[in-house]
Structures are given as C-alpha cells and as structure tokens.
Amino acid sequence: MTRPFNFSAGPANLPEEVLQQAAAEMLDWHGSGMSVMEMSHRGKEFISIYENAEADFRELMAIPPNFKILFMQGGGLAENAIVPLNLSRGASADFVVTGSWSDKSQKEARKYCDVQIAATNAGSDHTQLPPPASWNLRRDASYVHVCTNETIHGVEFQELPDIKTLGSDAPLVIDFSSHVASRPVDWSRVGLAFGGAQKNLGPAGVTLVVVREDLMGHALPACPSAFDYKTVADNHSMYNTPPTYAIYIAGLTFQWLKRQKEGDVTGIAAMEKRNLAKAQLLYDAIDRSQLYFNRVGSECRSRMNVPFLLRDESRNEAFLAGAKAHSLLQLKGHKSVGGMRASIYNAMPLAGIEALIGYMREFEQKHA
C-alpha cells in the first residue's frame, strides 16, 4: 500500500516505521501477552516504557539535569491555565502575542494573574515578529510567555530570545507545541517549555512539559493536584493514570528521531538540517509562482507550517479536490486565515514536499 502524504496541522502524520512497529506490537508487547493499551501504568512493563521514553527525550533534546520532564494531559490549551496556576503566584505575567495561540494563552492567563501584552504583531496581521528590543517587559513579572511557532499564521522565532538581556529577571515560558523536536533548544534561556505531542511527537493525548526544578512548588491553592507540577514530578507523571498508549507511541517516535541522520549529524541536528531544506524548497516554489503567495516575512517563516494563498480564491476548492486526487491530504488553511496550509513536520519526507510542488506547478499551468 502506498500511503498518501498528510499535511494536517495536527493530529499529524507519524513516521511509518513507528506505525509499523506499533502494529507489530499491538497484541503482544515484547512477549508480555498484553497490548500496551491493556497494561497497568504501575506494572513493570509500562514502567520500562515510561522510563525509556523519558530518558530518550532528555537525551534527544539535550535537557539539563535540573529540568523535570512531565507527561501530562489536556494539551497546550490546558497548559495556558496550568502555567499561571503554577508560576504566577497570583501576581503578573508578560505575554508576547504573535498569533492565534499566544492570544489564546494570554486570555486564559487573565483568569489567574495580571497580564500585560509586552509586544504584539497584530499591526502586521501576524505576518512579522516584533523585535525583542521593542518588548516592554516588567522586571517583576512572574514569567514571560512566548509561542515560538504559531501554527495558524506560520510565523516562527528562528532563535529563542534572551530576555535577561532585555532587562527581565522572569523565566521564559515557551509553547513549542508545533515545532518541538524539529530543532535544538537553548535551555539556558528557558524556564519552562510545553507542547502537545500530536504534531511532531505522537498521537493526541499526551502533553510534554519541561520545567526547571526551582520553578516548581509554588502552585496557587486553587491549582488542582493533578496539575501541580511538583506533585506530577514527585509521582513520575503517574499521580493519576497517564495516557499510556500515547506515551508509548511518543517513546517510539523519540527512538525514531534518535536514528535519523543527515550527513555527519544525527538526531535533532539532523532533523533541523532536513526541516530547513524541506521548508526552503517549498517556500522557493511559492515565491517563484504567479498563482501562489505567502504573506509572512522571510525572516520569520515557519519551518513547520507553511500557509499560502491563491491569487484567485475562486480556485481554492478545485485546488483542494485536485490535491486529494493526487494523494495530498488536508491542505485546507485554517478558517481564520483561509487559503492553504502545508504542515511539514518531522515525519513528512522530502518526497512529500516534492509531490506537493509538482502538483502545485501542474495546477498553475492548467489554470494559467
């Protein structure tokens, strides 16, 4: 069976090797006689799955020992509440609003603390990023929140801001849901990172949280115990029953990522190199076209989520129908921005980009 290329923004395509391994182990994991779905989360079989997944993610992302890795639930939307419940101490937080997801974050945080919009790119209709030097950060803020890749608008911070040089003593919180494990992270600049797994790491159901140890233990009294980072960490992410199968698939994905190689580099360095090449190929094709265009500034274009528009919007439905006929799936853009969107996460092979570009050229020639 030849599988189509799936450009969904999330849940998204998974590495075929991971799906094949999961299928082979579905009824009997490593001779246990059980599917992972059937295991007790406190049994030795699942404990080994969990411990390996945690260790592999730490190694893969080069996470320092003073950070805890938590496997939580609720996705990025829940973290928009869980972060202020744990870090705000009921005081204040600064937000850099660069698109739909960071805007949702600041609105949710207002329920728990005083929120200041330190910077926004709304004036550019979320097609540029506000320069860090222009951010109005408060020295006494509990944390600074940045969504480092906006899935809908297709803008990405190519480098993490160093907010200490901007006069802030607050920890930086990053929502890296849609580009986690696509590039290295400078953990010296981060206090907490969170991301749903369903774009780059696995199926929906598990949320990865990486939190510096000194930031735990300060949850508001109203914070549910299951969302208290220290409680979750002290119980090895098993204070409540974790999403066991989602953790298992994420663990298989971590192993797949560790095996990836591009030239003389492996793991995340290889993925960064591969992702840069894939994105550049697609953006170049869009920029050379007379039919398609991308509105995002070249210096902040996302490597993961590539929105593009047709100059003749009346051809949108024909484009999507033709794409489906060419086994190119889920290219429709988000309803808030329209047009098309190709999400080209880690599992999207170069062949998928080439197939999409080939179809785009064919469609343009036909409708010139």
Curated annotation (Swiss-Prot):
Binding of L-glutamate, residues: R42
Gene Ontology biological process terms from the UniProt entry: L-serine biosynthetic process; pyridoxine biosynthetic process
Molecular-function annotations in GO: O-phospho-L-serine:2-oxoglutarate aminotransferase activity; pyridoxal phosphate binding
Modified-residue entries (N6-(pyridoxal phosphate)lysine), positions: K199
UniProt entry tagged with the keyword S-adenosyl-L-methionine: no
Catalytic activity as recorded in UniProt: O-phospho-L-serine + 2-oxoglutarate = 3-phosphooxypyruvate + L-glutamate; 4-(phosphooxy)-L-threonine + 2-oxoglutarate = (R)-3-hydroxy-2-oxo-4-phosphooxybutanoate + L-glutamate
Matching Pfam families: Aminotran_5
Gene3D superfamilies named among the record's database cross-references: Aspartate Aminotransferase, domain 1 (3.90.1150.10), Type I PLP-dependent aspartate aminotransferase-like (Major domain) (3.40.640.10)
Entry EC number(s): 2.6.1.52
PROSITE patterns hit by this protein: AA_TRANSFER_CLASS_5
Subcellular locations according to the entry: Cytoplasm
Cofactor note: Binds 1 pyridoxal phosphate per subunit.
Pathway given in the UniProt record: Amino-acid biosynthesis; L-serine biosynthesis; L-serine from 3-phospho-D-glycerate: step 2/3; Cofactor biosynthesis; pyridoxine 5'-phosphate biosynthesis; pyridoxine 5'-phosphate from D-erythrose 4-phosphate: step 3/5
GO CC, alphabetical: cytoplasm
Entry keyword Cytoplasm: yes
Major site of localization recorded for this protein: cytoplasm
Binding of pyridoxal 5'-phosphate, residues: W101, T151, D175, Q198, N240, T241
Keywords linked to the UniProt accession: Amino-acid biosynthesis, Aminotransferase, Cytoplasm, Pyridoxal phosphate, Pyridoxine biosynthesis, Serine biosynthesis, Transferase
Major enzyme class: transferase
NCBIfam families hit by this protein: PRK05355.1, serC_1
PANTHER family: PHOSPHOSERINE AMINOTRANSFERASE (PTHR43247:SF1)
Subunit structure and binding partners: Homodimer.
UniProt record similarity statement: Belongs to the class-V pyridoxal-phosphate-dependent aminotransferase family. SerC subfamily.
HAMAP family attached to this UniProt entry: SerC_aminotrans_5
Identification of the protein by name: Phosphoserine aminotransferase
Lineage: Bacteria, Pseudomonadati, Pseudomonadota, Betaproteobacteria, Burkholderiales
